[in-house]
Every structure is written in structure tokens, then in C-alpha cells.
Amino acid sequence: RIVVVDPGRGGKVVCACGVIAVAAGVAPGMALNSALALLPDARVLARDSRRERTLLETVAVMALDFTPRVNLEPPDGVLLEVRGSLRLFGGVRQLCARVGERLRARGLASRIALTPKRLASLWFARSDMEVVLRRPEALAGRLAALPLACTRWPERSLRSLATMDDWPSLVTRPA
């Protein structure tokens, strides 16, 4: 029944919500009044950026058990470079399962996405898509299914990219 609003946006827009709220039809970006119409007994909380950062740092420290290469992607992401850890943990699926188990044991929900490009992994996770893609050539086709908003790029950039048929190829080209 939890609905989180961003005080920086006047406290009138939902920025996150719990499972019960989602089941009732509440979604991030929705006006608070609309959310309350769907879930009148919602528990409305103000977003706390400091606590979010502390939680990300806690997750990052836990992730060091799996790899020494961990990066924070505030406000909601932690990226792990796991190529060197795969053999140690029995492969991709086993490693992802262990990371997920560790997070669940701490009461945290997660979306794990593993791709050859770190931003692509972040975008899949932000889009609620758990994927494991090891071949770079498979990436562009899968990226095309993602909403551009998952990139969190400026609105002007999103409008420009939306006019391009093959925007994923721009992201997946070798550097």
C-alpha cells in the first residue's frame, strides 16, 4: 500500500510504489490524486534521497562479495562487472541467482540484467526486464523493445531518438 512522492516535484507525483499499489493500478509518474482514487488507503511517503543513497551503498558493499568492480548508478542502480567472476560462481545463471538470493534475504527486490554493455543492463533493469545476453550482436534487437524513457536522457534527446528507426545501433556500436 506504499506510494512514494517526490517532494521536489511538489509532492503531487508518484515516483515509486509498492507491490500492492501496483496491483491496484498505481504507477510512477501518476498524479497523487489519481493514485489515491485507485488506492484510498495508500500510505503516502515522501521520497528520501539520502536514505536511497545509503541503501545503494549498502547494496554495493554486498555486491563486493561477487566482484571487485561495482558502480553506483543513482538513484536506483548498482552495476557489477562480473566477467571475471563467472567461473568462480558457476556461470552466469548461478551468479545471477546468488545475487538475487542475497538481495531477497535482505528484503530487497531486484531486477537483474546482464549484457555486454553496462548502460544496456541498466536500461533493461529499469524497464523491469530481467535478461541475460552474452552476445553483442543480440543486443540491438532487444534494445529496440525498450521504452526510450528508461535511458533518462533529456526530453529533447528522447524526442530526437524517437524519430530514428535504429537508435539501438547507436548505443551498441563498438567504441
Spans of model-derived segments:
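Residues that scaffold, gate, or flank divalent-cation-dependent active/transport sites
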Residues: 1-79, 84-86, 92-101, 110-118
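Generic, well-ordered alpha-helical scaffold segments in large soluble proteins
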Residues: 38, 62, 102, 106, ...
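Compact, charge-rich alpha-helical regulatory domains located at protein termini
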Residues: 125-175
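Residue-level signal for secondary-structure boundary elements
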Residues: 67-71, 107, 111, 151-154, ...
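Short coil/turn linker and secondary-structure boundary residues
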Residues: 30, 47, 90, 134-135, ...
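Intrinsic disorder/low-structure terminal segments
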Residues: 65, 88, 123, 157-160
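Hydrophobic alpha-helical positions that pack around
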Residues: 91-146
